[in-house]
Amino acid sequence: SDEFDGYTLSPQWQWHANINDKWAYYAGDRSMVRLYSYPVPDNYKSLWDVPNLLLQKTPSDNFTATMKLTFRPNPKYKGERTGLVVMGMDYAGLILENTEQGTVLSQIACRKADRGGTEKTNDSVAVKDSTLYLRVKFSADGSKVKGTDDLLVRCNFSYSLDGKKFRPLGETFQAREGKWIGAKVGTFCTRPAIRTNDGGWTDVDW
């Protein structure tokens, strides 16, 4: 939770790697943080390899996280991405990407990301609005993953154009406690490994 009213990050936020000033601008007077589209590493396989993930620890096994963001990709490039991600050795999220067909919102998942796993797209929808509300609901009822002592935590994703009516997208993501330890939720803004200074950005309100 954060309204981004300051000119530095609140302590609950952490970058996925050592901070680089080129990743973000903290506009406290506008109550938002701007994430600049930053090139992925040359050896990129998944978000596990991306340093400019802005994340915070999950507070419990039952809660809802909602993020309002405005995506401004550079029309010269294709493949710039942003979104809401639940990050761990397995991860899933709602990802906005500028493509040849326009902006597409996808629900993605990646198993064994720490071992070189690749992303899978579960569902996609074309969107025309630049501002969206992205949501993930975490839920656990105490049940365990079959054959283990791992707590079964389910994540369900949805999105909204107005912040009121949310539409589900994609599949339920199951996070096991063994991989759940240290899991975080947050956002990012990336582009393919294009080394120029005129990429797009994402403004995150909260």
Where are each of the predicted segments found?
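Extracellular glycan-recognition regions
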Residues: 1-206
